[in-house]
């Protein structure tokens, strides 16, 4: 049993198994993006090419399927509470579709301006999306005068 009023910093794939239904007030997560190197889906070469080719991934849970963890996120979140999920343009549509299939209400997307550019093969990105979802009935958000960027 997880102690009440606690902030949990751990592997959600493991920790969520110990959580009761409707027991979490807020979920804020930044799942691993399906990348192998340099912000791309496939191996693009460079310094990490050999190391990544041997391991096949950069992140420990690179192969984690959103269909496996999103229903659990919905299960543990209390009704009326919010879920924020960081993602990039590659995962955006998949996260939106699966979250709404699980029962989440999509509120809006926020922009995380990182103030620095991330290297890639095309245009350099300096932002990521934060998807804002709600489970169940509306709950007031404090300080709505804050910009969404």
Tell where the protein language model's regions lie, with residue ranges:
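Core catalytic lobe of class I
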Residues: 1-149
